[in-house]
Amino acid sequence: MVKILNNLIFVLNCGSSSVKFAILNPDNKKKYLSGLVECLFLSKTYMKWKDLTTEHKKCIGSNLSHKDALNFIFNKFFLEKKDIYKNIVGIGHRVVHGGNKIKSSTLIDDNIIQLIQKAISFAPLHNPANLIGIKTAIEKFPIFAKKNVAVFDTSFYQNMPETSFLYAIPYFFYKEHHIRRYGAHGTSHHYVASEVALILNKNFNSLNVITCHLGNGASVSAVCNGICVDTSMGLTPLEGLVMGTRSGDIDPSIIFFMYQKLGMSIDEIHTILTKESGLLGLSGISSDFRYFEKKYYFEKKARLAVDIFCHRLSKYIASYMSLMENNLDAIVFTGGIGENVPLIREITLSKLLLIGFKIDTQRNLGIKNGKHGLITTDKSRPAFVIPTDEELAIAQETIKIIK
């Protein structure tokens, strides 16, 4: 029997249609349990989980809500595995948006819950789900009522300069309504930046790196001397790169045109830009990058969608070079696409030859499915693939806060 160490953290990440969870030791980085409940609100809801030795998958019901999924997780893993439960010392929650008031990870109390509630308009798909996770955890585990910690995606961007976070609209809207760029995926960007600092044997406070979190949602961040100085997502996670179903950057006049000339409602336009655009909108077929990887050389629309994705990504990377004080240590690719699609990394870096990046084809092709490492030639500026581990990052923040 494997000995369970003390100081375990239970991590919850409630997404718009899924619940990720993990139980791990933030000191030795060992995961005793990790899992995902997906396809919430659909005809079949599945749970995949992995303990120290075995992977499992099963259908756990139909049309399940976040609360249903959480109840299933709690009943299965905490009632059955009491040896794990008794060693848990706190619960860490991923929260997408902290609004303008919350600057860093924090213990959760009624005031923090209210502030997360107020920020729902900035993250309407995620913050409500995050709140369900928080409230359910407090209800199920009153013993940890004062040991729930919120770790915010937006915290990493709180030190960005005004030149990066302000929009060129009347200042009144920032002062009175807090309209500014907040960013997202901050926990992931911070984690992989910290990891590449270790690889390069650099103090984090002197690190200059551009991190690319590429998944169904995608963003780029510029870290200069250990501080994030710019990022591609804005007031909401709609701004920036081309994404799975999100448009990313567009001319705002497109919205006026759709409303005034095409007679579309604001809700219809919002749905199009967030759920029907990006790779799905360009191809008319899919938002799944596995499809684009297979069809890139054979279908015109698939190729066009990928090329537009990489075009936008390479432009952001190149523009962030100007923020690096003439010294860029590395680029990092992470996220489901960044870690597992060599094609995207190759196309993107091929556009950055002028600034010193040259792909090593064999290295690049060999790094996916959880592997990490260098993907450029030895004489090139370095680019790395580093798998993100948001659960570990959240656990490390949680143990730091509760201690």
From Swiss-Prot:
Q: What Gene Ontology molecular-function terms does this entry list? A: acetate kinase activity; ATP binding; magnesium ion binding
Please list the residues that bind Mg(2+). Answer: N13, E390
- Required cofactor(s): Mg(2+); Mn(2+)
Give compartment(s): Cytoplasm
Q: Where is this site: Transition state stabilizer?
A: H185, R246
Ligand binding (substrate)? R94
- Which transformation does this protein catalyse, written as a reaction? acetate + ATP = acetyl phosphate + ADP
What PROSITE patterns does the record point to?
ACETATE_KINASE_2 (PS01076)
Q: Name the residues annotated as catalytic in the UniProt entry.
A: D153 (proton donor/acceptor)
Residues the entry annotates as binding ATP: K20, H213, L214, G215, N216, G217, D288, F289, R290, G336, I337, G338, E339, N340
How, per the record, is the cofactor bound? Mg(2+). Can also accept Mn(2+).
Keyword annotations = ATP-binding, Cytoplasm, Kinase, Magnesium, Metal-binding, Nucleotide-binding, Transferase
* EC code: 2.7.2.1
Question: What pathway does the annotation place this protein in?
Answer: Metabolic intermediate biosynthesis; acetyl-CoA biosynthesis; acetyl-CoA from acetate: step 1/2
Task: List, alphabetically, the InterPro entries matched.
Answer: Ac/propionate_kinase, Aliphatic_acid_kin_short-chain, Aliphatic_acid_kinase_CS, ATPase_NBD
Which BP terms does GO give this entry?
Answer: acetate metabolic process; acetyl-CoA biosynthetic process
Subunit details for this protein? Homodimer.
Family under the similarity heading: Belongs to the acetokinase family.
Function as written in the Swiss-Prot or TrEMBL entry: Catalyzes the formation of acetyl phosphate from acetate and ATP. Can also catalyze the reverse reaction.
Q: What is this protein called?
A: Acetate kinase
